[in-house]
Amino acid sequence: MAIAQLATEYVFSDFLLKEPTEPKFKGLRLELAVDKMVTCIAVGLPLLLISLAFAQEISIGTQISCFSPSSFSWRQAAFVDSYCWAAVQQKNSLQSESGNLPLWLHKFFPYILLLFAILLYLPPLFWRFAAAPHICSDLKFIMEELDKVYNRAIKAAKSARDLDMRDGACSVPGVTENLGQSLWEVSESHFKYPIVEQYLKTKKNSNNLIIKYISCRLLTLIIILLACIYLGYYFSLSSLSDEFVCSIKSGILRNDSTVPDQFQCKLIAVGIFQLLSVINLVVYVLLAPVVVYTLFVPFRQKTDVLKVYEILPTFDVLHFKSEGYNDLSLYNLFLEENISEVKSYKCLKVLENIKSSGQGIDPMLLLTNLGMIKMDVVDGKTPMSAEMREEQGNQTAELQGMNIDSETKANNGEKNARQRLLDSSC
């Protein structure tokens, strides 16, 4: 019964899809380094300046100071300050020394910076939800296939070495010829139709991801230019005047002779806002050329990452470059960004350095001495250690011993029953 249960467990375990113990590629970067830098600066700087503006407001306690008559109590002076601060956005209640100016921009300056920060975060947010999942799945497939290509090359190199060793050991010509032909077929089968190469070539005719990428970069550039225009206009506005005249004669105070017709008011935070606008403007002006550079990054047509794989026979025909803007140019950039996750690249980079040193060493000969990259985790199977194999062997031996003991006891029981029957008949 125990043997049948163990056999059933082994049979059904082959049909079950086991979950991988840990992900093969952890921490894939789905955003280019230059794009992430632009996002952090463009979004983080306004938020930092907003925090400074609100800290200044908390420390000072008021954003406006109106010069009330000495006969006014502190409550009446506070009412004048509150009334004129609330009337900043009303053009008919305010009159500046330089004419009618939109002084409400001073009041809403921190909130406009917050608006630009939100707008600049929208393109990365769109990229994260619209394009990043597709790129993540494709990158995992491509990097996994690159490791498999490396493993196939090692198998082929070792099979060729075994062929040479058997040629020296075998003296029968017919057997040697048949063996060499079979090994050559196995080696050649490793190099037929590399799927990763064919898959990358299909991306030359695809423009879906590159359109999303260029759209996000263009939208970021437009928002930064609009922010620069606003900050420049605000700086020129704040440099004209931060003082204005306010009238509170309305309602029941219209005919009150004790209330002055006009009050001279001054916006206290304009100087701080002017400094913050200059800082933000300078940073955005310096950031705009970087955003323009990101538009032309996919046009570089770099395939340096895959060039190291040309050492392998599988990649002898991998001599293609992206022409213009297409998804292939974008995948090359993201492969370069995540190349540290590809183990086969590190091994082949060592072989390339040895080959370029001019020592005359055949890279294919070195492949026979390299270890294969474990792909069991990707397939959902964990490699069985020696201790687990020994434990399973012990369990099998115990089950066999239990089976033998049960058969021995059954035979002894039958013999005892026969003996009792013979004794009773006598």
Curated annotation (Swiss-Prot):
GO-annotated molecular function: actin filament binding; ATP transmembrane transporter activity; calcium channel activity; gap junction channel activity; identical protein binding; leak channel activity; monoatomic anion channel activity; protease binding
GO CC terms in record: bleb; endoplasmic reticulum; endoplasmic reticulum membrane; gap junction; membrane; plasma membrane; protein-containing complex
Biased composition (Polar residues): 405-414
Substrates-to-products reaction catalysed: chloride(in) = chloride(out); iodide(out) = iodide(in); ATP(in) = ATP(out); K(+)(in) = K(+)(out)
PROSITE patterns named among the record's database cross-references: PANNEXIN
Effect of R217H: Found in a patient with primary ovarian failure with intellectual disability and sensorineural hearing loss; uncertain significance; no change in glycosylation pattern
Extracellular-side segments: 62-106, 239-266
Localisation: Cell membrane; Endoplasmic reticulum membrane
Residue intervals passing through the bilayer: 41-61, 107-127, 218-238, 267-287
Annotated family: Belongs to the pannexin family.
PANTHER family cross-referenced by the UniProt entry: PANNEXIN, PANNEXIN-1
Subunit comment: Homoheptameric.
Protein name per the record: Pannexin-1
Organism: Homo sapiens (Human)
Gene that encodes it: PANX1
